[in-house]
């Protein structure tokens, strides 16, 4: 039996679910579950704006999620179960780790760990599992699992435009990233300049779609880099609808990523992309070489 902990925002939940899918592919005769219990208790609502974001979102968005949630009886067999994410983190520092638990270090998040999918016996997996190599062989299954719901009129129109043009998605994430020692300073203006030059080197007339939580900054700083190219700002997908920026990115012919899980999934789920450009490194002070799919173009930052 294998159980994968689900926690964090939508992008991280997708990585963790994808890891469960990869486990099932590697261990077809074993039971594989996901653990979503940390989202079920009122205590987490107080902390919703930190790392729990909009709560458990996978089944709200995706109708093809088919890995079952672990019942408490199963959890008790493999982990020191406490039905609260924050209290369980405290307990992990006090109680010894059980032999059935594999708790990945943060430094391992973007690193492929050989043999991790084939550990013998009952295992409870806790981590972020953001290495692309885990998912290359189950990409078709993940595209099916993460097929988006029916779009509203605004996004349906954009999907049609994006698929019928020489579209380039540019994702710019600012906000809390500006103060983060882990993420700040990587996707700077020089990165976007290099990426845009790379895209425009083919001589085509591109239409650029800008996805960002700071549109005003993009108007002042990104638009001047685009010359006379057509530019459209995607502005209506906010709050619980912000996931639609990720879905729209998955239709773009070319994509300039930010160092964001939304960018990652927009690129990975994209069946139309001719070029995907990604920043390197992905994070400051950490080996993130495993997060990149082999075909992505890395630009040094």
Segments (PLM) and residue ranges:
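Leloir-type glycosyltransferase catalytic cores
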Residues: 285-301
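Donor-binding and catalytic core of enzymes assembling or modifying cell-surface/extracellular glycoconjugates
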Residues: 10, 201-278, 283-286
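Short, aromatic/basic amphipathic alpha-helical patches
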Residues: 44-62, 218-227, 289-293
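A short, glycine/small-residue-rich beta-strand->loop->alpha-helix junction that serves as a flexible
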Residues: 5-15, 43-45
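Secretory-pathway luminal glycosyltransferase catalytic domains
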Residues: 48-203
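Extreme N-terminal starter segment of soluble prokaryotic enzymes
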Residues: 1-3
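A short beta-strand-loop structural module common to alpha/beta enzyme folds
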Residues: 30-42
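Histidine-anchored nucleotide/phosphate-binding helix
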Residues: 13-25, 192-200
């Amino acid at each position: 039996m294998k159980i994968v902990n689900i926690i964090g925002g939508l992008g991280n939940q997708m990585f963790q679910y994808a890891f469960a899918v990869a486990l099932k592919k590697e261990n077809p005769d074993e039971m594989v579950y996901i653990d979503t219990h940390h989202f079920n208790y009122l205590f987490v609502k107080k902390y919703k704006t930190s790392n729990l974001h909009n709560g458990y979102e996978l089944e709200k968005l995706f109708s093809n999620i088919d890995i079952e949630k672990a019942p408490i009886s199963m959890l008790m067999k493999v982990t020191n179960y406490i039905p609260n994410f924050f209290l369980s983190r405290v307990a992990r520092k006090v109680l010894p780790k059980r032999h059935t638990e594999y708790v990945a270090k943060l430094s391992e998040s973007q690193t492929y760990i050989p043999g991790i999918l084939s550990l013998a016996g009952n295992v409870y997996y806790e981590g972020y599992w953001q290495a692309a190599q885990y998912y290359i062989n189950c990409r078709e299954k993940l595209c099916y699992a993460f097929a988006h719901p029916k779009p509203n009129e605004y996004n349906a129109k954009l999907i049609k435009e994006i698929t019928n043009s020489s579209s380039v998605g540019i994702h710019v994430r600012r906000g809390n990233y500006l103060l983060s020692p882990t993420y700040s300073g990587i996707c700077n203006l020089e990165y976007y300049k290099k990426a845009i030059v790379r895209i425009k080197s083919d001589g085509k007339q591109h239409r650029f779609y800008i996805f960002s939580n700071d549109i005003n900054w993009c108007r002042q700083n990104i638009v001047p880099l685009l010359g006379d190219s057509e530019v459209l700002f995607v502005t209506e997908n906010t709050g619980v609808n912000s996931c639609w920026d990720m879905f729209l990115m998955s239709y773009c012919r070319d994509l300039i990523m930010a160092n964001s899980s939304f960018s990652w999934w927009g690129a990975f789920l994209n069946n139309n992309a001719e070029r995907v450009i990604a920043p390197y490194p992905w994070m400051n002070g950490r080996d993130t070489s495993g997060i990149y799919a082999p075909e992505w173009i890395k630009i040094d930052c």
